[in-house]
């Protein structure tokens, strides 16, 4: 008979299988999770590769288009260069003939006086005459003498330079008086800054050198002129050390240098770092954003704007932002508000100056007004009224203007009456006793502040003379002095005499008895003349 299996043995043999099943199930779960992660990772990589591939394809396509357009442009420039040169030569011949005719007329009629110009036509005629003669020194003197006619000069100089035989040569010779190195004397150099004239003349030269076929994309500058312009630029850069470095260069000089580079097309990529420092140091100039782009700093504009913001020049940063179209990266309204906050902090520091409170208040008002006007002008220029309503700023500006006007009004000061040193009553005019018609007072005379000399005292045996009260002597002063002792009687102490100039010659009212004063003997003479 077969024995039945032991249940305990069955249980022992089944336990390893159950644990193994759990282990395999856990392993399958881990494999599923890993597969899912790997699938997502490779899918993401595939998508990124596809995006990058598409971006590269677009870049290659863009470069191909740019290359093709550049090749076509070069072909067009090559084809048109001969025609442009022919046109330029024809213009030069016409200018030469016009210059010769002008010189002949000048010899026949005498030199015209270009010093006095009444209107725009006269200004243009004078400029044309100087350009035809290639009179660089006269041209320079004519321009610098008319700074008040700056707008007319901007519009008329390019027209006049068209008639010049060699406009670049005339311009370089004209500005050579102060650029690249100022050749004037010390006194004139300090008093007059002619950087504005250099900039106007250099700007006016650009439309004259524009290619008649290609337009502004190509300037007709001869190799000799370009080499001369490069030498001038190198001379200016070499003079920076003598001026104390970039930080000490004047803004008009920086503006002239950058405009010189743009006008003659002599920008160097190796000097971009120098150009950036110069632009940031003179960023408040209105033309600086355009010049920065023209000298090849367009790619560095975001970093330059960040630098301006860090330096506290938010207003300049706004101008740069709009010039290069980076408004989406640097919103203008927060920058303008930050500029106003910084201005308010600066005024608070000035207010803390307790040494000169009046001057501090004036500086605070002026600085705040300047900041408000600059922000209002920026809002108007870039049409930011919806984002930054200017009403509150205008109200604040009007309030400051009103306060400034009220402070300028003269204060009403009451007239002070002249009084004696030892008496609170009114004092008669200083010249009352010196004129023929003596002043007649309706008040009793104040008491004197001095004692009669001891030599006139009765205790030394000299009796006090008596006299009747004075009579009216019409318009004349009494011919003699009288003693007030006759009116008031004798005193127990030394009597007091009254000054002649302030006696009651024409007053019937007797003066009250004055108190006795005993000043120091050395003060006798000083006090006696105190009223005169």
Curated annotation (Swiss-Prot):
Expressed in leaves, shoot apex, flowers and during seed development. Transmembrane segments: none annotated. The keyword Acyltransferase does not apply. InterPro entries: Frigida. It comes from the Eukaryota. GO terms for biological process: cell differentiation; flower development. Keywords: Developmental protein, Differentiation, Flowering. Pfam families: Frigida. Belongs to the Frigida family. This is FRIGIDA-like protein 4b.
């Amino acid at each position: 008979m077969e024995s039945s299996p032991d249940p305990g043995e069955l249980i022992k043999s089944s336990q390893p299988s159950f644990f193994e099943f759990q282990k395999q199930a856990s392993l399958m779960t881990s494999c599923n999770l890993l597969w899912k992660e790997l699938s997502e990772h490779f899918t993401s990589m595939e998508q990124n590769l596809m995006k990058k591939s598409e971006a590269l394809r677009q870049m290659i396509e863009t470069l191909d288009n740019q290359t093709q357009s550049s090749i076509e442009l070069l072909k067009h420039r090559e084809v048109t260069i001969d025609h442009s040169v022919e046109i330029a030569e024809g213009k030069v011949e016409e200018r030469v003939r016009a210059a010769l005719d002008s010189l002949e007329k000048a010899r026949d009629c005498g030199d015209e006086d270009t010093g006095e110009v009444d209107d725009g036509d006269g200004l243009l005629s004078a400029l044309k005459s100087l350009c035809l003669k290639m009179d660089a020194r006269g041209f320079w003197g004519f321009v610098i003498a008319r700074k008040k006619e700056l707008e007319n000069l901007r519009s008329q100089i390019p027209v006049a330079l068209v008639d010049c035989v060699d406009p670049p040569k005339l311009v370089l010779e004209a500005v050579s008086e102060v650029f690249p190195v100022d050749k004037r004397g010390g006194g004139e150099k300090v008093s007059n800054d002619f950087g504005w004239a250099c900039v106007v003349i250099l700007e006016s030269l650009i439309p004259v050198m524009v290619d008649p076929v290609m337009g502004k994309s190509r300037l007709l500058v001869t190799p000799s002129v370009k080499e001369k312009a490069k030498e001038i630029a190198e001379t200016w850069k070499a003079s920076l050390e003598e001026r104390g470095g970039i930080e000490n260069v004047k803004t008009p000089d920086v503006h002239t240098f950058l405009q010189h580079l743009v006008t003659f097309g002599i920008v160097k990529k190796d000097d971009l770092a120098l150009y950036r420092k110069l632009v940031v140091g003179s960023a408040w100039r209105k033309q600086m954003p355009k010049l920065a782009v023209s000298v090849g700093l367009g790619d560095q504009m975001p970093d330059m704007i960040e630098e301006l913001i860090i330096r506290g020049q938010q207003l300049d940063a706004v101008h740069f932002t709009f010039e290069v179209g980076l408004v989406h990266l640097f919103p203008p309204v927060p920058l303008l508000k930050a500029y106003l906050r910084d201005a308010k902090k600066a005024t608070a520091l000035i207010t803390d100056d307790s040494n000169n409170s009046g001057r501090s208040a004036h500086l605070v008002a002026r600085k705040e007004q300047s900041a408000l006007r600059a922000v209002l002008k920026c809002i108007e220029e870039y049409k930011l009224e919806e984002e930054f309503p200017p009403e509150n700023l205008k109200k604040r500006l009007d309030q400051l203007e009103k306060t400034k006007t009220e402070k300028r009004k003269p204060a009403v000061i009451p007239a002070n009456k002249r009084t004696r040193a030892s008496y609170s009553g009114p004092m008669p005019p200083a010249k009352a006793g010196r004129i023929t018609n003596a002043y007649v007072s309706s008040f009793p005379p104040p008491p004197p502040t001095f004692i009669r000399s001891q030599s006139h005292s009765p205790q030394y045996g000299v009796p006090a003379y008596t006299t009747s009260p004075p009579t009216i002597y019409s318009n004349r002063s009494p011919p003699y002095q009288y003693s007030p002792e006759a009116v008031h009687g004798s005193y127990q102490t030394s009597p007091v005499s009254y000054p002649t100039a302030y006696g009651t010659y024409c007053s019937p009212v007797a003066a009250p008895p004055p108190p006795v004063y005993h000043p120091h003997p050395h003060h006798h003479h000083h006090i006696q003349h105190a009223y005169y």
